[in-house]
Each structure stands twice: as C-alpha cells, then as structure tokens.
C-alpha cells in the first residue's frame, strides 16, 4: 500500500501535526490545494496508525499552560472538550509522614520535626504545609486542566471530519522500513499468531505501507523510535537514563468536596520523599489524582499502585476524596531526560516529534503542549517542502523542520531545563535545591549530577531494607510470594511499617479489581506477546525482580521457579518494564534484559 505521509502513533504530537496539515490540504471551496505525488489527481494521502484500540485510550490527565494549543485554536472554548477546565487555582503542599513509614533522609526528618513544632505559625493542617507560593516555573496560571484522552478524541474527530486524514486505531506498527540509509514506510504487526509470534489460524502478515515521509510519534517507549535510535544513532552526549511512571486515578468526588473545577494541587514529601503527587479537578465533580514514581527512587520494591493508595490516604488528600468512587485508572512511562533525550530528529524519509523526540520540559514538568508544538512545527516544515516540490531528504527536513524547532520556545525552554533534574542523582534534597536554582536563574545554575541507566543504580532488597527488615525475613517473603505467584512489595511494605490498605470496594480497591474498572484492561486475540525476557536464566536468578514489582497492571508475575512471566491480558502498555530491570544487557550496557515490542490492547478508557 502506498501513501504520501504515514504517522506512527496518535498522541498530542500527531494531533498537532495532523491538525495543522489537514487545514492546508484542501481549499475553502473543497478543491485540492496539495495534490498527492503517490496518487495524482487526489489530495495528499495521509495515514496515521495508532496502537491502542481507540483514540485517546491509555493516555493521561494533565495541567498545561496551553501555549501551543491556543495558537492552534485561538478561539478555544474549554467547555467544548469533555473534562476540560481553565486553571482556577493552584497550590503546592509539602506532605509530612502521618504513619512514620517513609524512608526520609536525616535532614528532612529534622525539618519535619521543626515544621510540626511551629505548625500553628506555618499553617500546618492535616499533616501538610502549604507553601506560600508556587515557583514561577511550575505555575500553570492561565492554563487548562485536561483529560488528554478526551482531548485526543476531540482532536481526532476534527481531523477525520476534515476528510483529508485517515486515522486507524488498533493498528500497531511492527517496524519502520529502512532502505538505503533512510525510511520508506512502515510494516504493521502480524495478526493471527500465537503468543510466541508463530502463524496460527487466520494468519495475516503485517501490511507494508510505503510513504515518502514517516512521522514517528510513538512516545518514549515506542518500538519504532527505539528502532531508529539503534539504526541511526543518537547525538553524542544524549541519553534516556531518567524515567518515571505516572499513575493516576479518575475519581467521582463526594458531595462534601468543595474544590472547584480547575483546581490544581501539587505535592511532595509523601509517601516517599522522591514521589511527587498531583490533584486536578475537572468539571462535574470529577478529579484526576496521582503520583510520579521516578527512576532515581532507588527502591527495588517500588510499586506505583500501592504508593498511590497510600498517597491518597494522606489526610490532606483524603479529606477531599473520602466517600468518592474510583471511576478508572491509568499509568504511563514518562521520558524524564528532556532535551538530553533528544534523538536524531530527521533523516531521509523520516522525522521525530513528541515526547520521544526529547520535547518534555523537565523543569516545568510539562510535555503535552511541547509535544503538540513539535507536531505543528513539523507540519509547517512539511507544507514548505511540498510547496517547493522537494523530496523529504534529511537536508530538506533539517532546513524546514529542525531549524524551525531550534528557533522555537520549545527549544529555548528545553535548554533552560536541561540540567534541572541532575541533582536528584545525589538525593532528594540536592535535587530540590538544583531544581530551584535552575528555575530561579533560568538555567544558569544547577546541582551537578550524572544520570546513569536505571539498572546501574537499583540496590538489592537486602541493601534497601538494611536496618528495617533482616535478610532472612526478606528471603522468607520472597519465597512465599513466588509460591503464590505474586509480587513482594505488599508484604515488604507492611513489614517496613506501612499500614494495610483498608479496601472499601468503592474508592480503595485491590489492584486486581482495578483492572476491571472503567475502561477494562483487555487484549485482542491473535497477537504475539509484546514483552520479551531476553535472558530468562538471568531473570530467574535476579534477587529483586523490579520488573514484577513495578508492573502497573500485574501483567508481569513470578512464574515457574520464580522466573518472570507475562500475561498480555493485564498489560496496560505503560512501558515501565522497559526501564525497570536490575541487570544490564550483555550486548548493550544502556539497556536491561527486557524488550518491549509493538502490541495491541491495554486500557480501554479515554479518561485515563
């Protein structure tokens, strides 16, 4: 099959690209403005393949300054987008530890004692202290609270309604077609295969779609982006060592909650100092609330779902949500290297946009608006190339797209933020000092630190729990958990002092039950497993198995002899397993022992 332009992935970046491009393909009278080189006489042929089973499935809620979005939609009315609201108020809370179980550094414990002693003066309430101001670099005043799933569906409807673009959900892309040092299209995944990928009944080989330009927007864990990194390399000094899992609940707020739509709450300090929280209020008494668990949180038993429940039970959060109902939930890997994670942005026949192109601002904690704007800039460059009847060569794309990006606010702000997170390699306090220094000096000062691949910094369970749980107890918990086919984090956390979660079946539900809520997690038959354990014996002898602990959907679990096993029916496609591994790949010191391929299924909710 032939096309002119093929896009991989439909997220904010593709949304910006296709919105801008589609507006220029036809004239106002409906006649063709840009003719297709591959199908003369027809308008430009543009296809977009999305892995998830529908548009907007499996992405997240967000607060954004909406700088780029408002350029694309100058008359934007948030009320036309489900779950959207203007930012009405914003505050930053430092959460004290109400249960005494978090692993806080000594200086933070001293500070906590002082804060409690001066609670009346500092306005401490519900074991939380509101900071007197939100740092300017985090301030989202004038922005929007969005459900990106709902926003993507809204954008997709407009793009497809133009009649100039085809978007195909439930269409994972297996690989880019690389020929003669360039990309000439994509190949979709095989269907009708066993979990091992072998042909079965109704086998259908993946279709080749050839195009003059392939736009890669498959996110930070996308297999096509990683394929191009391997094929063409990344700029010297660039890396993708810093990651986080963002996990959130979508909650129906109780009648007692008086938070107005557009309220934004940021938190730090609990359940562990390294974990940051967010609380965004949508219209109609709905809220998105969740946490970010970073790769520099050196716990081999880190589990976002369990920590999210403990965070929600903090008195400062619980008072707003008690009596509410969990509607749905979701999780996503976030590329936290920012501009230093930027790959090669363009080559012969291809261009990279979005989070996987290093657009996330790691100082302002924002990525949606930046991703959208990279898509807009590529579309503007593509239209320039088409107008001049030039081919999509690396040279032409560099001139029309990359140079445009280098002059943009995305680039300028990204350079300011580039070193903002380095201090976290030294600990939470140096990290916070470094972020403040970077923000206040516009990038002139920062706390030095050298990010390392996650597998090089994760300690063993025995090292992490030294002084709190004996090695003998850890071994007992490990064996008992393996025998039951479950992860160890729940037993380890309770043994370390964390209280059991008081499940109520409404707001506090078990991880297993959450898989059935809202957009039920499911996977269609006839596709191969997309998680592969490259060296099973090494996985079997691994003492920590952080891939099991961190799995957002319990899709990775202890199998035979404790070896990690994978259940595609539970996978939410967050990609956490790609960077949560305790052992280095013998063939690539930057990688772990897990490969994450193109796959179907996952979350079935456009709220997440």
Label each region the model flagged.
Residues 20, 24, 39-120:
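N-terminal FAD cofactor-binding segment of flavoenzymes
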Residues 283-285, 344-363:
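Short FAD-binding loop at a beta-strand-to-alpha-helix junction that anchors the flavin cofactor
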Residues 2-47:
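N-terminal Rossmann-like FAD-binding beta1-loop-alpha1 element of flavoenzymes
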Residues 319-341:
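Flavin (FAD/FMN) cofactor-binding core of flavoprotein oxidoreductases
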Residues 20-23, 40-42, 147-149, 153-154, ...:
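Predominantly flavin-linked oxidoreductase catalytic cores and closely associated redox partners
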Residues 121-153, 157, 292-294:
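Helix-loop-beta segment of a Rossmann-like dinucleotide-binding subdomain
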């Amino acid at each position: 099959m032939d096309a002119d332009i093929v896009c991989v992935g439909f997220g904010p970046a593709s949304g910006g690209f296709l919105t801008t491009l589609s507006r220029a393909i036809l004239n106002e009278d409906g006649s063709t403005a840009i003719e297709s080189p591959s199908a003369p006489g027809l308008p430009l042929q543009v296809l977009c393949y999305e892995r998830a089973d529908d548009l907007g499935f499996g992405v997240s809620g967000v607060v954004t300054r909406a700088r780029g979005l408002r350029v694309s939609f100058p008359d934007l009315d948030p009320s036309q987008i489900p779950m959207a609201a203007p930012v009405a108020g914003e505050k930053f809370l430092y959460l004290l530890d109400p249960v005494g179980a978090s692993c806080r550094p000594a200086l933070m414990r001293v500070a906590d004692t002082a804060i409690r002693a001066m609670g009346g003066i500092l306005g401490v309430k519900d074991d939380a202290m509101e900071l007197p101001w939100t740092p300017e670099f985090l301030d989202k005043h004038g922005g929007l609270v969005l459900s990106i799933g709902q926003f993507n569906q809204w954008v997709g409807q407009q793009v497809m309604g133009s009649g100039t673009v085809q978007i195909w959900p439930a269409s994972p892309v297996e690989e880019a077609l690389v020929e003669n040092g360039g990309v000439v299209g994509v190949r979709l995944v095989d269907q009708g295969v066993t979990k091992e990928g072998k042909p079965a009944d109704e086998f259908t080989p993946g279709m080749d779609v050839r195009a003059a330009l392939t736009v890669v927007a498959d996110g930070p864990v996308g297999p096509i982006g990683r394929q191009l990194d391997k094929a063409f390399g990344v700029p010297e000094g660039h890396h993708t060592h810093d990651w986080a899992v963002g996990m959130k609940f979508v909650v129906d707020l109780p009648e007692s909650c008086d938070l107005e739509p557009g309220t934004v709450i940021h938190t730090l300090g609990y359940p562990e100092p390294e974990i940051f929280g967010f609380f965004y209020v949508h219209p109609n008494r709905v809220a998105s609330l969740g946490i970010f668990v970073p790769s520099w949180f050196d716990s081999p038993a880190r589990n976002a779902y369990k920590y999210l429940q403990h965070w929600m039970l903090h008195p400062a959060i619980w008072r707003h949500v008690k009596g509410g109902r969990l509607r749905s939930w979701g999780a996503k890997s976030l590329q936290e290297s920012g501009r230093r994670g930027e790959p090669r942005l363009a080559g012969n026949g291809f261009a990279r946009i979005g989070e996987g192109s290093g657009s996330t601002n790691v100082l302002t904690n924002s990525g949606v608006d930046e991703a959208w704007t990279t898509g807009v800039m590529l579309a503007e460059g593509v239209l320039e190339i088409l107008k001049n009847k030039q081919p999509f060569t690396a040279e032409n794309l560099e001139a029309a797209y990359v140079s445009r990006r280098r002059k943009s606010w995305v680039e300028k702000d990204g350079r300011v933020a580039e070193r903002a997170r380095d201090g976290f390699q030294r600990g939470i306090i140096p990290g916070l000092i470094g972020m403040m220094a970077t923000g206040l000096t516009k990038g002139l000062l920062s706390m030095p630190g050298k990010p390392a691949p996650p597998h090089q910094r994760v300690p063993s369970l025995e090292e992490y729990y030294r002084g709190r749980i004996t090695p003998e107890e850890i071994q007992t918990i490990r064996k008992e958990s393996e025998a039951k086919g479950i992860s160890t984090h729940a037993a380890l956390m309770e043994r370390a002092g964390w209280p059991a979660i008081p499940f109520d079946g409404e707001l506090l539900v078990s991880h297993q039950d959450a898989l059935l809520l809202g957009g039920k997690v499911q996977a269609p038959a006839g596709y191969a497993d997309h998680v592969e354990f490259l060296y099973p014996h090494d996985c079997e002898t691994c003492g920590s198995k952080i891939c099991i602990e961190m799995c957002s959907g319990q899709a990775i679990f202890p199998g035979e002899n404790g070896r990690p096993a994978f259940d595609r029916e539970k996978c939410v496609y967050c990609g956490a397993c790609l960077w949560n591994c305790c052992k280095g790949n013998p063939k690539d010191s930057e990688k772990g022992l897990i490969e994450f391929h193109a796959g179907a299924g996952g979350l079935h909710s456009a709220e997440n």
